[in-house]
């Protein structure tokens, strides 16, 4: 039989009141924080992705595809507004 590591068994942790008091606050707050992060548009700003209404501008309505492997930088300069 192996020795004890001194850690509490998982079943004791899950059935304790302290576990559920802590997690009944932290789990919903993480969900709400994630929902606010996405719904306010902050996720678009942090990760630099365009918002759904910014994929196609008034000047450019075609798909922004790179078709030439060796001229990709020039095509990218044409597609990205400065």
From Swiss-Prot:
GO CC aspect terms: chloroplast thylakoid membrane; photosystem II reaction center
Presence of the UniProt keyword Membrane in the record: yes
Coiled coil regions, renumbered to chain: none
Localisation per UniProt entry: Plastid, Chloroplast thylakoid membrane
Gene3D superfamilies (alphabetical): Photosystem II cytochrome b559, alpha subunit
InterPro entries, A to Z: PSII_cyt_b559_asu, PSII_cyt_b559_asu_sf, PSII_cyt_b559_CS, PSII_cyt_b559_N, PSII_cytb559_asu_lum
Needed co-factor(s): heme b
Organism superkingdom: Eukaryota
Keywords: Chloroplast, Electron transport, Heme, Iron, Membrane, Metal-binding, Photosynthesis, Photosystem II, Plastid, Thylakoid, Transmembrane, Transmembrane helix, Transport
Main subcellular localisation: plastid
GO molecular function terms listed in the Swiss-Prot or TrEMBL record: electron transfer activity; heme binding; iron ion binding
Topology with respect to the bilayer: Single-pass membrane protein
Any one biological process term the GO annotation gives: photosynthetic electron transport chain
Transmembrane segments: 21-35
Family under the similarity heading: Belongs to the PsbE/PsbF family.
Function (record text): This b-type cytochrome is tightly associated with the reaction center of photosystem II (PSII). PSII is a light-driven water:plastoquinone oxidoreductase that uses light energy to abstract electrons from H(2)O, generating O(2) and a proton gradient subsequently used for ATP formation. It consists of a core antenna complex that captures photons, and an electron transfer chain that converts photonic excitation into a charge separation.
Oligomer status and interactors: Heterodimer of an alpha subunit and a beta subunit. PSII is composed of 1 copy each of membrane proteins PsbA, PsbB, PsbC, PsbD, PsbE, PsbF, PsbH, PsbI, PsbJ, PsbK, PsbL, PsbM, PsbT, PsbX, PsbY, PsbZ, Psb30/Ycf12, at least 3 peripheral proteins of the oxygen-evolving complex and a large number of cofactors. It forms dimeric complexes.
This protein's name: Cytochrome b559 subunit alpha
The species this protein was found in: Ostreococcus tauri
Gene name tied to this protein: psbE
